[in-house]
Curated annotation (Swiss-Prot):
Cofactor note: Binds 1 Mn(2+) ion per subunit.
Example of a GO biological process term: 3,4-dihydroxybenzoate biosynthetic process
Matching Gene3D superfamilies: Divalent-metal-dependent TIM barrel enzymes (3.20.20.150)
Gene null: resulting phenotype: The deletion mutant cannot produce petrobactin on iron-depleted medium. In vitro analysis show that mutants grow to a very limited extent as vegetative cells in iron-depleted medium but are not able to outgrow from spores under the same culture conditions.
pH dependence: Optimum pH is >9.5.
EC number from the UniProt entry: 4.2.1.118
Outcome when changing residue 175 to A: Only trace activity remaining
GO molecular function, one term: 3-dehydroshikimate dehydratase activity
Protein name: 3-dehydroshikimate dehydratase
Swiss-Prot/TrEMBL catalytic activity: 3-dehydroshikimate = 3,4-dihydroxybenzoate + H2O
Length: 280
């Protein structure tokens, strides 16, 4: 397993892509997960500078692991526009040399879907997968509240319903734990489809609401309860023990304050724990 940082961690800071690349390199990250809006802006407004930086990534043993975006598959959406966005993302992913696109399976909980509505979403997800398959790219659905992948049973059911080889999973361990499932058991059941992990933690289940989109994307949002991996309620020692031999990236998805300080400290702790495992 390798570690990546998320550019979304710097969503409220004035920091360049060049600075993020250098920070990742200096602190032992091997990948960068690009937020979709960052990828689009770099392509449209910083093309030449970003092109030079991308050409240097390999020398720094870095890569763009995934573009994380949001594809609207709701029945009220203009699906033609969603397909157009998919085509744009394929262009971006090709430029950034990644084959993974993260999105969500809708915007409401799986229990709130009628069978007919669920089938319409399944059809749309399959069409999106088919489009990206033409570019040899994968669609990663994130396990997340208020989506069709908000529980382990619904996630497994959805994978079977869509039944497309280019549909994969970004396993967010905190959110699968939030659903009431055991994180390690969820990993074992979803393992054939997993292509990426999100690591984050919370001090108490009482604060899970701080990860709701309206709060987490707000510059003045509440960050209470957001803590480093090994200071929270989810047992990451157990999780890392289980997944460390897999060949996937785990993004440290930090949404709180002081992103550089926290990420730097997290990598030191992770490196030290890995060395302890190797030498024990």
């Amino acid at each position: 397993m390798k570690y990546s940082l998320c550019t979304i961690s710097f969503r409220h800071q004035l920091i360049s892509f060049t600075d993020i690349v250098q920070f990742a390199y200096e602190n032992g990250f091997e990948g960068i997960e690009l937020w979709g809006t960052h990828a689009q802006n770099l392509y449209m407004q910083e093309y030449e500078t970003t092109e030079r930086e991308l050409n240097c990534l390999k020398d720094k043993t870095l890569e763009i692991t995934m573009i994380s975006d949001y594809l609207d598959i709701s029945l009220s959406a203009d699906f033609e526009k969603t397909i157009e966005k998919c085509e744009q993302l394929a262009i971006l992913a090709n430029w950034f040399k990644t084959n993974k696109i993260r999105t969500f399976a809708g915007q409401k909980g799986s229990a709130d879907f009628s069978q007919q509505e669920r089938q319409e979403y399944v059809n749309r997800i399959r069409m999106i997968c088919e489009l990206f398959a033409q570019h040899n790219m994968y669609v990663l659905l994130e396990t997340h509240p208020n989506t069709l992948t908000d529980t382990l049973p619904s996630t497994l059911e959805l994978l079977g319903e869509v039944d497309h080889p280019n549909l994969k999973i970004n396993l967010d361990f905190l959110h699968i734990w939030e659903s009431g499932a055991d994180p390690v058991d969820s990993f074992q059941q979803l393992r054939p489809w997993i292509q990426h992990y999100h690591f984050k933690n919370i001090s108490s289940a009482d604060y899970l609401h701080v990860f709701e989109p309206n709060n987490v994307y707000a510059a003045a949002g509440n960050r209470t309860g957001m803590v480093p991996l090994f200071e929270g309620i989810v047992n990451y020692d157990e999780i890392i023990q289980e997944v460390r031999d897999t060949d996937h990236f785990a993004s440290l998805e930090w949404f709180g304050h002081n992103a550089k300080d926290i990420l730097k400290a997290e990598m030191k702790v992770l490196t030290n724990r890995n060395l302890e495992v190797v030498t024990s």
